[in-house]
Amino acid sequence: MHAERRSGPVELLGLDRPRLAAFFDTLGEKRFRARQIMQWLHQRHVYDFDEMTDLSKALRQRLREHARVGLPEVAADQQASDGTRKWVVRLADGNCVEAVYIPEPKRGTLCISSQAGCPMGCTFCATGEGGFSRNLTAAEIVGQVHVARQHLPEGAITNIVFMGMGEPLLNFDPVISASRVFTDDYGFVLSKRRVTISTSGVVHAIERMQRVTDVSLAVSLHAPNNELRNQLVPLNRKNPLERLLPACHAYIAEKPHRRITWEYVMLDGVNDQDEHARELLQRLRGIPSKVNLIPFNPYPGARYGRTPDRQVRRFADRLLEHGLTATIRETRGDDIDGACGQLVGEIRDARASKVARPA
């Protein structure tokens, strides 16, 4: 069994159903108890074992002795003028990560963090500027969703995206466990299409994803060639486009009507010209794709400028003219530093950002 803690009580919040069933095996209990606990935690929002009334008193006592359910603390709760909401979530060791809720007319998307800080060092992102502390546990990932649900109307969260702080695929097992909790019929009951893992391009882990999950995949592309992408996304030096694009194509090859979302932050005069659009079209030819163009969100000390809206529209039109689906992401939550690339949290014992070895 993969447990959240190596010693002491087992943290149940982040255990997917097979791991929760394995935990009950160690207690000599029937495996169906996993379904009961998941429903209490994720559907009824009950975290006190004494209130889980369909469990025997003896089992509740054993759970108190061998397990725990801990929610992270809300250090700050901010709401933007456009309705976007950001929670700064304090973890037990003092690290703070951020989760952002983005309401839209037909859906509500929660953007969650997978690491305290980020080791990737992307040159256009504030998160990487703060350094990297550690991976989050599955419980700390799932806990962000529980915190958000406590502050939102029932059913407000329809989509979950791993697009907050950190590189999800460098924290592979906890991220996959959390995603399984989100899609389980006894968990959050979200469609796998409504859970998205966003990566900067850890090829080995994308190939591993293909064997263990079929949630949606988004890739932070940001450049149509290796020379430019090496500058913007240092991971590209070991995971070049010649490896990344085939791995992504293979991930959706046996998934009908699925496509890869390519995230592309628009940097003034850097990656936003007509020749970049033409090159991008060539790169993505034959891969079912959607390109999400993201206006750059400046932050203190940023080395890049924001592409003018007119040029963003022109870039999108160039892609659309040649049959490639392209959307322009509306900037949300920038007045509370909750927009893409602005999440910084509060990182304890941070190490300088550097590209970690693929998981």
Curated annotation (Swiss-Prot):
Please list the residue ranges annotated as the Radical SAM core domain. Answer: 104-329
SUPFAM superfamilies linked to this entry: Radical SAM enzymes
Mention one GO molecular function: rRNA (adenine(2503)-C2-)-methyltransferase activity
Q: How is the cofactor bound?
A: Binds 1 [4Fe-4S] cluster. The cluster is coordinated with 3 cysteines and an exchangeable S-adenosyl-L-methionine.
- Does this UniProt record's set of keywords contain Glycoprotein? no
Q: Which InterPro entries match?
A: Aldolase_TIM, Methyltransferase_A, RlmN_N, RNA_MTrfase_RlmN, rRNA_lsu_MTrfase_RlmN/Cfr, rSAM
Q: Where does S-adenosyl-L-methionine bind?
A: G166, E167, S198, S220, L221, H222, N297
What does this protein need as cofactor? [4Fe-4S] cluster
- Tell me what reaction this enzyme catalyses: adenosine(2503) in 23S rRNA + 2 reduced [2Fe-2S]-[ferredoxin] + 2 S-adenosyl-L-methionine = 2-methyladenosine(2503) in 23S rRNA + 5'-deoxyadenosine + L-methionine + 2 oxidized [2Fe-2S]-[ferredoxin] + S-adenosyl-L-homocysteine; adenosine(37) in tRNA + 2 reduced [2Fe-2S]-[ferredoxin] + 2 S-adenosyl-L-methionine = 2-methyladenosine(37) in tRNA + 5'-deoxyadenosine + L-methionine + 2 oxidized [2Fe-2S]-[ferredoxin] + S-adenosyl-L-homocysteine
Which residues are connected by disulfide bridges in this protein? C111-C340
Q: Which residues form the active site?
A: E98 (proton acceptor), C340 (s-methylcysteine intermediate)
Main subcellular location of this protein, as a coarse class: cytoplasm
Q: Which GO terms describe its biological process?
A: rRNA base methylation; tRNA methylation
Positions binding [4Fe-4S] cluster in this chain are C118, C122, C125
UniProt keyword list: 4Fe-4S, Cytoplasm, Disulfide bond, Iron, Iron-sulfur, Metal-binding, Methyltransferase, rRNA processing, S-adenosyl-L-methionine, Transferase, tRNA processing
Q: Which domain of life does the protein's organism represent? A: Bacteria
Going by the record, the broad EC class of this enzyme is transferase
Where would you find this protein in the cell? Cytoplasm
What are the EC numbers? 2.1.1.192
Q: Which GO terms describe its cellular component?
A: cytoplasm
Family recorded in the similarity comment: Belongs to the radical SAM superfamily. RlmN family.
What does this chain do? Specifically methylates position 2 of adenine 2503 in 23S rRNA and position 2 of adenine 37 in tRNAs. m2A2503 modification seems to play a crucial role in the proofreading step occurring at the peptidyl transferase center and thus would serve to optimize ribosomal fidelity.
For this protein, the record's NCBIfam families field holds: rRNA_mod_RlmN
The note filed under miscellaneous reads: Reaction proceeds by a ping-pong mechanism involving intermediate methylation of a conserved cysteine residue.
- Name of the protein in question: Dual-specificity RNA methyltransferase RlmN
Which species?
A: Halorhodospira halophila (strain DSM 244 / SL1) (Ectothiorhodospira halophila (strain DSM 244 / SL1))
Q: Which gene encodes it?
A: rlmN
